[in-house]
């Protein structure tokens, strides 16, 4: 399945609406933009179409398949790094006019059975964004303790049946060996969770939890947001599209935390830690976009601007 980029024009519009950006390269009229989640290149291609001849676009992605897709972009202004977006801090300080983070998993990733992201297809229980590093979900489940499995399902999937699901996974492992396929896990969850949320497969939350955990998605997001403060030039834009409440909560709290002056109660006469971001917008996809692309329904885009401090 081809990937339809969510909030495509809105995100790029927000990224470029920053006339006050003062990146180090601005003396020559050039700006540096970052697509921190290249995916299948939807945002990058539109960003390139909006850039001047001297601007540069740096993309990041952990997925080797994304790098193959990036090879189809023949533009000297574009480069991509086979890294997660937590590596943003490797860019020079105050050098970037705009950072875009699209936290959604791409349709080709979901719909490729070999990647193991979906309960709809028979495939190996992998779920790694970068298949060249780390262990798969199946490998982790083969040795994980019941309490840890339950913690992951509860904390990252917000699943109220986390305990019974974890116990069922371990019981299955002890009786017949570890789970190795997506459909095995989906069926086990369906057999364990006796209530159904309307319109949702009972395995949805468990699959989300394991994917987030095995890729350290929330930890990497926190690192990337912190790095954005370092690399964004004054006036530079931070645009983040999230797809579930855990991600959006982190983004919302980060922007709020850095959008106000902070006083040290232990030193009431000391100067405050001055705000570093200005919250600008919160946007949801239009009804028309959701109708055309149902995977957009949970998306939330937040925009903030780096202040001069």
From Swiss-Prot:
GO terms for molecular function: rRNA (cytosine-N4-)-methyltransferase activity. InterPro entries: RsmH, SAM-dep_MeTrfase_MraW_recog, SAM-dependent_MTases_sf. Keywords: Cytoplasm, Methyltransferase, rRNA processing, S-adenosyl-L-methionine, Transferase. It catalyses: cytidine(1402) in 16S rRNA + S-adenosyl-L-methionine = N(4)-methylcytidine(1402) in 16S rRNA + S-adenosyl-L-homocysteine + H(+). HAMAP family: 16SrRNA_methyltr_H (MF_01007). Transmembrane segments: none annotated. The keyword DNA damage does not apply. Its EC number is 2.1.1.199. It is found in: Cytoplasm. Pfam families: Methyltransf_5. Belongs to the methyltransferase superfamily. RsmH family. It is an enzyme of class 2 (transferase). Specifically methylates the N4 position of cytidine in position 1402 (C1402) of 16S rRNA. GO terms for cellular component: cytoplasm. GO terms for biological process: rRNA base methylation. This is Ribosomal RNA small subunit methyltransferase H. S-adenosyl-L-methionine binds at residues 41-43, 61, 85, 102, 109. PANTHER family: 12S RRNA N4-METHYLCYTIDINE METHYLTRANSFERASE, S-ADENOSYL-METHYLTRANSFERASE MRAW.
């Amino acid at each position: 399945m081809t990937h339809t980029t969510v909030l495509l024009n809105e995100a790029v519009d927000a990224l470029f609406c920053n006339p006050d950006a003062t990146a180090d390269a601005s003396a020559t009229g050039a700006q540096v933009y970052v697509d921190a989640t290249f995916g299948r290149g939807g945002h990058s291609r539109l960003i390139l179409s909006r850039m001047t001849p001297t601007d540069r676009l740096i993309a990041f992605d952990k997925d080797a398949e994304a790098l193959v897709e990036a090879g189809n972009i023949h533009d000297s202004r574009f480069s991509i790094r086979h890294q997660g977006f937590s590596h943003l801090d490797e860019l020079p300080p105050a050098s970037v006019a705009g950072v875009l983070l699209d936290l959604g998993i791409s349709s080709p990733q979901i719909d490729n059975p070999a990647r193991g992201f979906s309960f709809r297809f028979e495939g190996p229980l992998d779920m790694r964004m970068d298949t060249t590093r780390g262990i798969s979900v199946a490998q982790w489940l083969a040795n994980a303790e019941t309490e840890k499995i339950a913690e992951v399902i509860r904390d990252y999937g917000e699943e109220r049946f986390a305990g019974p699901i974890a116990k069922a996974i371990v019981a299955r492992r002890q009786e017949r060996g570890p789970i190795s396929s997506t459909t095995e896990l989906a069926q086990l969850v369906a057999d364990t969770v006796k209530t159904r949320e309307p319109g949702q497969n009972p395995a949805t939350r468990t699959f989300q939890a394991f994917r987030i955990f095995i890729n350290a998605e929330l930890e990497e997001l926190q690192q990337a947001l912190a790095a954005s403060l370092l690399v964004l030039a004054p006036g530079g834009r931070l645009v983040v599209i999230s797809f579930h409440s855990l991600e959006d909560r982190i983004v919302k709290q980060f922007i709020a935390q850095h959008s106000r002056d902070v006083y040290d109660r232990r030193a009431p006469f000391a100067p405050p830690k001055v705000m570093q971001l200005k919250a600008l917008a919160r946007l949801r996809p239009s009804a028309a976009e959701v109708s055309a692309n149902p995977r957009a329904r949970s998306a939330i885009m937040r925009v903030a601007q780096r202040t001069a401090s």
